[in-house]
């Protein structure tokens, strides 16, 4: 498989001198197109900080990260913003849906930010709502949707710009077990493909079965990457 992410000695600290605290320390790993990589570990182990550096949100203090063979932190701020808009899709735990917009308008936001025509953006949004099984909910406000449906709207919004890298932060934390498994079945069977890499931060051991590999973190360091036996 082609390498989607190559992180080398990634390090991030906060504070200086005797007050310096390492959030992530010398983390190196590769992730590949066509796989789902879980990043797991206790709260405060550096998982979200690591993904923030990989996705161009938080600059590392040392180390490098290449996404699709591009050293993202060698780019200018404008280039990094363009990289995030075109290459990375985010699905957050609390969805971040705008209550005053329709479901379709929420999904269209990344395209509007890219200055795409409004009507084309809405058509594309409706297509991806269809992909996640919610085209008939396109004109509803998010408050009219269930938690699982809102999560699928967030997935559609992450997909609409056709990113190479999808990042999920605790995607099932606020969902019941059955809904969480349905979301992961959907991600595994409908969203993953050979030209896309999916990274998922989670505490939810109920969904570990959907990972191709699991990277474990403790105290800002990786303590192992394991391939699931049935993959």
Q: Where are the language model's segments positioned?
A:
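ABC-family P-loop ATPase nucleotide-binding domain
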Residues: 1-13, 224-231
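ABC family nucleotide-binding domain
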Residues: 4-5, 10-210, 214-217
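H-loop (His-switch) and adjacent beta-strand-loop-beta switch element
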Residues: 214-226
């Amino acid at each position: 498989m082609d390498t989607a992410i190559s992180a080398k000695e990634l390090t991030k600290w906060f504070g200086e001198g005797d007050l310096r605290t390492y959030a992530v320390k010398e983390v190196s790993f590769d992730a590949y197109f066509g796989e789902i990589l879980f990043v797991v570990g206790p709260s405060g182990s550096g998982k979200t900080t690591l993904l923030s550096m990989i996705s161009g949100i938080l600059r590392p203090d040392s180390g490098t990260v290449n996404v699709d063979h591009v050293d993202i932190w060698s780019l200018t701020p404008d280039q990094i913003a363009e990289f995030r808009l075109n290459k990375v899709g985010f699905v957050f735990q609390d969805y971040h849906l705008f209550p005053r917009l329709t479901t379709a308008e929420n999904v269209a936001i990344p395209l509007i930010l890219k200055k795409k025509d409004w009507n084309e953006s809405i058509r594309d949004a409706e297509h991806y709502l269809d992909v996640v099984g919610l085209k008939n909910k396109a004109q509803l406000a998010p408050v009219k949707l269930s938690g699982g449906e809102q999560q699928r709207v967030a997935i559609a919004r992450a997909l609409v710009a056709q990113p190479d890298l999808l990042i999920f932060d605790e995607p099932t934390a606020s969902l019941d077990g059955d809904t969480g498994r349905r979301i992961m079945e959907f991600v595994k069977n409908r969203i993953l493909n050979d030209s896309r890499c999916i990274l998922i931060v989670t505490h939810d051991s109920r969904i570990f079965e959907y990972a191709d590999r699991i990277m474990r973190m403790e105290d800002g360091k990786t303590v192992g990457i394991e391939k699931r036996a049935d993959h």
